[in-house]
């Protein structure tokens, strides 16, 4: 299955929430009406079954993190085999992806842009170049921008945008050096309350 290449705002409208797929330099509210799903007759929302609600939540989270269906299922199986809450384990695995951590640290405006930086070998983990977006980051790992990539205007622009975001407790970023430390796994309370991981667990448990 190929990665989605269509209009990104259409995905946000489909899920009824900002999936942070665009740069953030303009308010997404000025670009589209999130409360209206895409399509000519998008204003009227159909009544959804329990299964449809669970499926929509899974699609929302999958698109938020930019993960394809097959990889998402692998994460769920791994989360279900681990100790603790399956839903929280799933979110932790998604948060530990290198492309997500690069985005969280502000080196990329979006997770998609962060994946490009990784594939172009602009990102290092513990001083080693890693070009795998799904690479799992562990506590105390150091993520940095490669020296030859530090003058890229898109990275500088992303860091400027990051200054406007809320500081995250589980990572520490040195903007001047363009590097950061993944201090710990994020707790559930650290992450978005708009995600209902229990619906995803119910979907895959059937």
Curated annotation (Swiss-Prot):
InterPro entries: Ribosomal_uS4, Ribosomal_uS4_bac-type, Ribosomal_uS4_CS, Ribosomal_uS4_N, S4_RNA-bd, S4_RNA-bd_sf. Residues 96-156 form the S4 RNA-binding domain. Pfam families: Ribosomal_S4 (PF00163), S4 (PF01479). One of its GO terms (biological process) is ribosomal small subunit biogenesis. Keywords: Ribonucleoprotein, Ribosomal protein, RNA-binding, rRNA-binding. GO terms for molecular function: rRNA binding; structural constituent of ribosome. It comes from the Bacteria. One of its GO terms (cellular component) is small ribosomal subunit. CDD domains: S4 (cd00165). Gene3D superfamilies: Ribosomal Protein S4 Delta 41, Chain A, domain 1 (1.10.1050.10), RNA-binding S4 domain (3.10.290.10). Part of the 30S ribosomal subunit. Contacts protein S5. The interaction surface between S4 and S5 is involved in control of translational fidelity. Belongs to the universal ribosomal protein uS4 family. One of the primary rRNA binding proteins, it binds directly to 16S rRNA where it nucleates assembly of the body of the 30S subunit. This is Small ribosomal subunit protein uS4. It comes from Buchnera aphidicola subsp. Schizaphis graminum (strain Sg). The lineage of its organism: Bacteria, Pseudomonadati, Pseudomonadota, Gammaproteobacteria, Enterobacterales. The gene is rpsD.
